[in-house]
Amino acid sequence: MMVNLSQHSLIDKLIEYNEAFSSLTLATYGRWERGVASPSTKKKILVVSFFNDNKLDFIKNTKINISKTKIKQFNDFFEKIDYLGQFNSLLGYNSQFLGEHKIIKYDEVHTIDKNLDYKAIEKLSKFSVKMLGLKRTSILSADERTDWQLSGNLIYHVYYNILEGIHAHSTWSLHRHSDFELFVNLYKNSTLAVNFFGKPSSNEDCFIFIHALVFSTKEWNRYIFKELIETLLKNNRIKYILTSTWLPTDLLDLNSVFYGEIVGSTKNEMFPQSIKIKLIKIDVENFLGNHGIINWIKNNYKNLAIDKYD
């Protein structure tokens, strides 16, 4: 569709597409085309998304000068995650059963209401709402859950122990890009509820919301990152990640690793002692452009293909 664009028109559309191209000129673009200069990794991934091309193929097959320093920074970040996960594993619910585990993903094909009992769903829902400092009225009804799941906009990842007890979980939802400001304002006021939002359509830009960033065993931590990486590689409509955390920066530094930006904060009064929780936004290109993530993709997806969502 954009093959016949002139250079001027293409540059204008790139500037309109993302502020990272705000200073792009015809001269700079010409140097890129001639191979005299190279755009940053972030801009390269943005261009791939702009043309709706396959990001996995691009990262696998493009030579990218990977910084050992940045890979070490990512590895150090992951070591902290594993430490936090080990701590959570010993204190979380069902922590007394630390044997064999299994992970199940509930999505539009394998919906949670058809495959999990009511009490377990209630437990998951109450935990997510509690971690966000929301009231029970924010919990989705069975019909709302099914509606959002069947549309592909709500996913539950659940980590079971050997006795089928829930050891850890993570809930992800997709929201319309145009709802971002409303979402943040409702979050700040602890009044998030699904009835304020419409589901994103199949051709609408959106963001992915990770309801609570909770880590556990190394197996779980790597599974969550793998699923997030694959989701972002498949879906060019997702423009950024939004997640909430109560952890201080010295324990979970999403800023220096992924250029995460705090866009909101609130006090969570749902615990015996109130805690401050932060809402953090990460651009997809900053996440996938991290040299540790690029190294992960190049090492783990050499002979694999990931189909893009339509």
Regions found by a protein language model. Give the residues of each.
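Short basic helix-loop element that most often maps to the first helix and adjoining turn
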Residues: M1-E19
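A short helix-loop-beta-strand connector motif used in the catalytic cores of GNAT acetyltransferases and
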Residues: V3, T146-Y160, S178-F180
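Recognition helix of helix-turn-helix/homeodomain-like DNA-binding domains
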Residues: I15-P39
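DNA major-groove recognition helix of helix-turn-helix/homeodomain DNA-binding modules
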Residues: S40-K60
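Short, charged recognition helix plus adjacent turn
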Residues: I59-G92, D310
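Short amphipathic alpha-helix that is part of the acyltransferase structural core
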Residues: E79-E144
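Conserved beta-hairpin
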Residues: G152-S173, V184-K188
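Acyl-donor binding region in acyl/amide transferases
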Residues: L182-S265
